[in-house]
Design a protein with these regions (language model features):
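Anion-binding alpha/beta catalytic cores of soluble intermediary-metabolism enzymes, centered on
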Residues: 2-240, 244-250, 254-306
Length: 306
């Protein structure tokens, strides 16, 4: 696989490669072509040791299909009604793996075992969120967006935790004091739009008692987030317009659609990871390019670097 990704992500890969030893990744339902291409590229670059979990015959068939039949494989066969995601999690809990990667399984089937507190990947009071990092053409900075998979309609407390998780995740890019936007449809509080009122409340709380080491603005619409000129024309007084590092979205539909539109129609390139668990967890779609899997794994490895 060609290492074809924006130069802005190079610090993440460099940090991943500085990990003292390869990160042991349990790939659940590993019979996925593009997932394995990304996993094997990370292995070749020295920061991943893959453990392939699932139906062995299907895994070997995919490995042969992508031209990797000569590669030494560590396969853990799972048969019948056994859940490969659950098996992979048990490997982590037993100390035989460091993190988890989604393979050829539905998002729901991957996330439910991860979120199950009985599986010990999450502290009792923790909230797991999905952060996506994008390089959008025409926008100078890497842009983090969350939450895009887990929280259907987050309340004020949950949006605060989304923000905290995002700020923590941004450290893989050495961003220590990011500018965070609380996305809403309009830039003024409106009683009929709960998210605008909560954004105003969150900003007010942050000004009085800082929530995290970051700057926060909101409520703010997407055009103002991305453009200083739009802010000037609409007389929106915020020094961070056009220079935001992250966007906290109001709900799952807004976040998921925003990411998909930017990636499918605007040429954005990026990756995601799950944050808020005891370990960083990789996640990539089955139709995603191998580079997205590679970068998600690099981000997890970078998080493990002390």
């Amino acid at each position: 696989m060609a290492r074809d990704y924006p130069k802005e992500f190079e610090p993440i890969v460099a940090k991943a490669k500085s990990l003292g030893k390869p990160m042991r990744v349990a790939v659940a339902a590993a019979n996925s072509e593009n997932i394995l291409r990304g996993v094997f590229a990370a292995e070749d670059d020295g920061f991943v040791k893959p453990i392939l979990v699932g139906n062995e015959d299907k895994i070997r068939a995919v490995v042969n299909t992508i031209g990797e039949g000569g590669r030494e494989l560590d396969i853990h066969g799972v048969f019948g009604g056994d859940n490969p995601v659950q098996y992979a999690i048990e490997m982590i809990n037993s100390g035989d793996a460091d993190t988890l990667m989604r393979g050829n399984c539905q998002t729901r089937d991957y996330l439910l075992p991860v979120l199950n507190k009985a599986n010990h990947l999450i502290e009792d009071d923790a909230l797991v969120t999905h952060v996506v990092f994008l390089k959008v053409p025409g926008y100078e900075k890497v842009l983090a967006i969350s939450d895009v998979t887990l929280l259907i309609n987050p309340d004020l407390a949950e949006r605060k935790q989304v923000l905290l998780n995002m700020v923590d995740a941004m450290k893989i890019l050495d961003i220590e004091h990011p500018n965070i936007a609380l996305l809403t449809m309009v830039e003024k509080p409106c009683f009929h739009m709960r998210d605008t009122v909560e954004a105003q409340t969150l900003v007010a709380k942050h000004k009085k008692y800082p929530i995290a080491d970051c700057n926060i603005a909101g409520p703010i619409s997407y055009d103002l987030i991305m453009s200083k000129e739009a802010a000037r024309l609409k007389e929106y007084d915020c020094p961070y317009c056009g220079e935001f590092d992250g966007i906290v979205v109001p709900n799952l539909m807004a976040g998921n659609l925003l990411v998909k539109v930017l990636m499918n129609n605007a040429g954005a390139v990026g990756f995601g990871l799950l944050t808020g668990a005891k370990i960083p967890i990789a996640i990539s779609g089955r139709s995603d390019a191998p580079e997205q899997t590679y970068l998600s794994l690099a981000a997890c490895a970078a998080k493990l670097v002390k």
